[in-house]
Amino acid sequence: MRITAIAAAVLLLAACTPDEIVPTAPMALDGVSFEVEALPQAEGPCDPAQPFPARVTWDVTDWTDPKFDFLLGSTNGQLVARDNTSKGELVTDPWAREGLWILFVDRNTRLLVAAEPVPALVCPAD
């Protein structure tokens, strides 16, 4: 009986989980500015084929309780950072690659606020 109740609770919670969203085009809700910029590697020669850091900037107006998660690939993706401010900037470690989606999600509601793919790394001319 106890196992049945636990199983029912797990199924009920799973049913309440929001559907996974995998972005296919850049987006941002009204009043949200969200940008992703590719940065050259700090050490060694600039090589677009190798992972590189990315700079993420955001500015959200009129957000009651700014608590945001930065996820990779989808709304169920890997959590890479958290922030509790309506405006800010973060620079990632060198794991970014062209086309990797970075999602900006409200931590309280799981609402997708913005999404942008990492752009191609353009190396400075020698």
Tell where the protein language model's regions lie, with residue ranges.
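Sec-dependent signal peptide recognition
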Residues: M1-A8
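Surface-exposed, short loops/turns at beta-strand junctions within beta-sandwich domains
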Residues: V91-W101
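Structural beta-strand segments of beta-rich domains
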Residues: Q50-V56
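Edge beta-strands of extracellular beta-sandwich domains
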Residues: T24-A25, R110-D126
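Short proline/glycine-enriched turn/loop motifs at strand-loop junctions of beta-rich domains
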Residues: V60-K67, R97
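Bacterial signal peptide processing site
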Residues: T17-D19
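C-terminal motif of bacterial Sec signal peptides marking the signal peptidase cleavage site
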Residues: L12-A15
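Short beta-strand segments within Ig-like beta-sandwich modules, predominantly Fibronectin type-III
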Residues: L79-S86
